[in-house]
A protein has these predicted regions:
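Membrane-embedded alpha-helical bundles that constitute the cytochrome b-like, heme-associated redox core
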Residues: 2-165
Length: 165
C-alpha cells in the first residue's frame, strides 16, 4: 500500500473547479523545520542551564539550598519539552510516516525519534519514579539529551547528501 499525501498547487484548476494537486515531498515545511530546530535548541539550552546551576552554582546563602535559578531552569525545560513533543507529533503525521515507508534515512531518523521517546520516558521516571532510581535515570537523561542535537544534525546532513545524489 502506498501512502499519497497531496497538496494543492497554485496552478490552473481542473475544469470542475477542483485544484490540481502535487505530491508532498519528504522535506517538512519551513515552519516545522524551524519549530524542530528551535525546540531542540531550547531543550539543550535549558537543560544545560539546569546542569550548570545544579552542579556548579550554589545559593548565595551558603546553606546548601538549590540556587534560585534551578527551579526556573526546570520549568523552562518542561515548557520546551511540551513544545518539542507537540512539534514531533506534527512531524509524525507526514514526514516520519513517509520517510519510514520510503525506507529513507531510517537509521538517523529512527535514532532521533528513539532518543526523543527515551527522553520523554526518563523525564516521567524522574518526575514520578522512586528516589532510588533518580540518579541513574538523571544521568541517562543528560546523556541522551546532549546527544539529541547531534542526532538531529546527522539526520539533516544525511538527508541533504542523499537529496543531492
Amino acid at each position: 500500500m502506498r501512502l499519497h499525501v497531496l497538496r494543492p498547487t497554485r496552478q490552473h484548476l481542473h475544469r470542475h473547479g477542483a485544484p490540481r494537486v502535487q505530491p508532498l515531498g519528504m522535506r517538512p515545511p519551513r515552519w516545522q523545520r524551524w519549530s524542530v530546530h528551535a525546540s531542540v535548541l531550547a531543550l539543550l539550552a535549558t537543560g544545560a542551564l539546569w546542569l550548570v546551576v545544579h552542579f556548579l552554582l550554589r545559593a548565595p546563602s551558603g546553606d546548601g539550598l538549590p540556587h534560585p535559578l534551578e527551579p526556573w531552569a526546570l520549568r523552562l525545560h518542561g515548557i520546551a519539552a511540551y513544545v518539542f513533543i507537540a512539534v514531533l507529533g506534527s512531524m509524525s503525521a507526514v514526514h516520519i510516516v513517509l520517510g519510514w515507508r520510503a525506507r529513507r534515512n531510517r537509521g538517523s531518523g529512527g535514532s532521533f525519534v528513539a532518543a526523543a521517546l527515551l527522553l520523554a520516558l526518563s523525564a516521567l521516571a524522574l518526575y514520578y519514579g522512586p528516589e532510588s532510581t533518580h540518579a541513574p535515570t538523571s544521568v541517562l537523561h543528560w546523556v541522551v539529551g546532549l546527544a539529541l542535537l547531534p542526532l538531529l544534525w546527522l539526520h539533516i546532513v544525511i538527508a541533504r547528501r542523499r537529496a543531492r545524489i
